[in-house]
Amino acid sequence: MLHIIVRRVSLVVALGLTLGACGAPAAPGAPTPAASPLVAATPSVPPQPTVEAVDGAGQTIRLAGPAQRIVSLAPSNTELLFAIGAGAQMVGRDEFSDYPEAAKALPAIATGMGKLNTEAVVALEPDLILAAEITPPDQVETLRGLGFTVFVVINPDDFEGLYANVLSLGTLTGRATQAQGLADELRDRVTAVGQKLSSATTSPRVFYELDGTDPTKPWTSGPGTFLDLLIRAAGGTNVGAVLSTQFAQISSEELVRQDPQIILLGDTAYGTTIEGVSARAGWGTMTAIKQKAVHPFDDNLVSRPGPRMVDGLEQLARLIHPELFAQQSEY
C-alpha cells in the first residue's frame, strides 16, 4: 500500500508580552520598566515532502522528494517509467532496456547475465535504483550497502498487480497523476477485451514456444505464470498448464497428445521460423500445423511485466479468436 507522507513544520509565535499584559497593574510610584522591543518572528521554511512506498520485498522506501536520478535494472521498469512520463528522470539502465527507443541513449550499467558494474552505478549518483524480481538478491544488498536506495518491483500475479506497480512508480517519481491515468487506461483496455470475448463459445488450445533450440523438447510457460494468465484472459487454453513447473520443456509426444489448435512462436527473434516448426518430426498431425495456425509473436509483449502486457493481451485475443475481431482494427 502506498503512502505519501507530507510533514510540515507549524509556526509557533510566542505571545509572552500579550499574556503578561493580563497581569496585575504596577504599584503606585514604582518605576515603569522599559518595554522590550518586539522582534518579528522569522517564518520557518517547510521541508520537502517525504515520499514513502513499500516495495515488493516488503521494504519501506523513503525519499526526501520525487526521484530525479533513477537507474533501472529491468526492461519492465524502464518501460513503466517512460510510460508515466518519467523517462527523463533516468540516468542508467540494464542492457536489455531497449524500449522505447529513447532508452537506448542511456548508459547500460548491467548485463542480462546478472553482472552489475557497481563503479558505473556509483558514478551516476542515482537517488533511486529500481530492481526487479530477476535482480539477484545479493546485488540488491550490495547496492544498499553502498548507501543507495533500492526499490524492488516484483512481477505481478494479475492485472491488478500491474496497475499497482504503475502507481508505485508514479509515487516515487512525482508522476502520480500520469500513473493513475495510465493505470485507468490499461484497466479499460483489459475490460474491453473481456467484454469482446464474452461471446466466445470455444477456448482453443494454445502452445506458446519460448525456446525451440531443442525442437524435440521446446520450452514453454506452465501454470501460474503471467503468460498463462494472458492466454486464459485472451480466451484460450494454455497447453503448458499440464506441466508441473512454471517454465519447463515439453516433449513432442506430449504436444501431439495435447494437439494445440494454435502455435505461437515467441522465439522467432532467434531464428525460429514457421516453416521450420511445421516441418518438425511428428508435428504434422497437430491441428495447428494442418490448419496453418502457426504465428510469430513478439515475446517482449508477454515476458516483460510492464505496460505493454496489455498490448500482448490484445494481440493474443485477436490470434486466438479472430472471428470476434474480424470487423475491428483497434487492436
Residue ranges and their predicted role:
Residues 135-145, 262-280:
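A ligand-binding cleft/hinge motif common to bilobed small-molecule-binding domains
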Residues 221-247, 267, 296:
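His/Asp/Glu-enriched short active-site or ligand-binding loop at hydrolase and phosphoryl-transfer sites
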Residues 74, 133-134, 210, 243, ...:
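Short secondary-structure boundary segments
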Residues 69-124, 128-133, 139, 239:
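A short, structured surface patch at a secondary-structure boundary
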Residues 56-58, 109-118, 156, 243-252:
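Short helix-initiation/N-cap motifs at beta->coil->alpha
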Residues 2-14, 20-78, 177-209, 319-331:
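Bacterial Sec-exported substrate-binding components of ABC uptake systems
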